[in-house]
Amino acid sequence: MAFDPAANAGPPLDEIQWHTPPQFEAGIHSNSILYYFAQSPFYDKTSNNEVVFQQGLNNQAMSQYLATRELFESRLKEMSGLEFIVAQEPAETGPGMGTGVWVINKQTRRKRPPTNPARPEDGPPDEIIVHSVYFVVGENIYMAPTLADVLSSRIGAIATAITKTIPLVDEVSDWAPAVGRRYITPAQPSAGAGAASGTTNYTASRTATPLPDGLPSTATTNKPGAKAGGGTTTNDPLLDSLLMEEALLTHERYGTEYMDENPITGKPGDFHLTSTGRKTQTKSALTLKEAAAALPALNTKGLGAAGSNPLAKGAAAAAAANANAVTGKETKSPKTPGGGGPPKPKRRKSKNVITTPGAA
């Protein structure tokens, strides 16, 4: 059977914790941290670290680079390629005390051509590409997760929590045409007799829904232990059917009536606008129509002559009034014989004699 690397690769590197008893003097310190990391599965033997290590073991002139970490890393910085280098040392929290956390970067170094060949040290800095980060805590080595892995894990946890809450919300909510939205209070295990009786607690919606006449309100039917007719109220399919029928009848009868921004009180068929005091004129309009239909018809047959037709007399009087208004003449009312007082005597005009003084 052929060897399958994918099947024998084991768990992902960012999900394992590796440690081994250190085989160095004084344990893990600045000069032995890279050698200790080289024993872990995170290490890559094709890196420049392995090249410098093998050269120091087999070449006497290169063995000096294995003495300290500073010399070892200085040799790595002169080369191009993949390398493991200490990015952060343990922070000092006190005299001779550190956190014990080492940060190691797996990176690729690329050399840039110097601008002045005579002084290559003054050239541009090397190009560094970091592939992964590892941290050593005590004797344990971990691989730091990437930002994409952290976000994916958090989003997955949030989605799982939301998926679990949706069925719970569906279980505690209930809706009926007459009473609206209701929420069931989950029964507590230590509720005692209330939980043992099997009654269900409901929390009604904030907006009260008007109920048909003869039906109990939501405040009394939804409370545990509330009695209607001498017993505890429960969900009744027959009552639900009756409420549904009442709702449909109310909609068919008063479905054309709408509510506006003004607060409306009353019941279907008799709404009142509380802000202005106005009322719907539906009933008054119907009353006027019925009164107009109940008036008797006026019989005008046989009233052809003006003397016997009161309507003709009225028309003649109106025509005479209009004629007087046009000509400016007024019609004098006839004198009633014997109805007035004695006739006034006529006033005679006196003639005044004007005398002219004669000449002296």
From Swiss-Prot:
This protein's record includes keyword Transcription: yes
GO biological process, one term: regulation of transcription by RNA polymerase II
Keyword Transcription regulation among record annotations: yes
Biased segments, Low complexity type: 190-205, 316-325
Subcellular location per the Swiss-Prot or TrEMBL entry: Nucleus
Xref: Pfam families: Med6 (PF04934)
Record region (Disordered): 186-238, 316-360
Coiled-coil residue windows: none
Binding partners and assembly: Component of the Mediator complex.
Function noted in UniProt: Component of the Mediator complex, a coactivator involved in the regulated transcription of nearly all RNA polymerase II-dependent genes. Mediator functions as a bridge to convey information from gene-specific regulatory proteins to the basal RNA polymerase II transcription machinery. Mediator is recruited to promoters by direct interactions with regulatory proteins and serves as a scaffold for the assembly of a functional preinitiation complex with RNA polymerase II and the general transcription factors.
Family: Belongs to the Mediator complex subunit 6 family.
Protein name: Mediator of RNA polymerase II transcription subunit 6
Protein source organism: Neurospora crassa (strain ATCC 24698 / 74-OR23-1A / CBS 708.71 / DSM 1257 / FGSC 987)
Primary gene name: med-6
